[in-house]
């Protein structure tokens, strides 16, 4: 079942976001294995990211094998992060 992971970093900037992507992805437009969609934007008071994964297992593998070992990233996100996650029960596209 597809899985959604959302992170919000209060006070984070686009520069923090780009530093994290550079440290954790193989390229700026190459999604990690299992990630289907990636959305990110500045909210005015931080960075909000929502990633859609093919499964919770793929998401967990990325977090455990790539994201956590890469931390802390120089110039990356400040802590703490606000996290929400869910299995996707409805997916409608135009």
Which residues does each predicted region cover?
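Short S/T/G/P-rich N-terminal loop/turn motif that feeds into the first structured element of a domain
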Residues: 1-50, 54-68, 75-94
């Amino acid at each position: 079942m597809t899985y959604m992971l959302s992170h919000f970093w209060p006070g984070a900037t686009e520069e923090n976001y780009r530093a994290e992507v550079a440290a954790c992805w193989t390229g700026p437009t190459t999604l990690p294995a299992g990630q289907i969609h990636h959305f990110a934007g500045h909210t005015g008071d931080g960075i909000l990211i929502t990633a859609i994964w093919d499964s919770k297992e793929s998401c967990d593998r990325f977090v455990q094998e790539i994201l956590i070992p890469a931390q802390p990233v120089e110039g990356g996100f400040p802590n703490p992060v606000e996290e929400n996650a869910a299995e996707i029960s409805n997916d409608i596209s135009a």
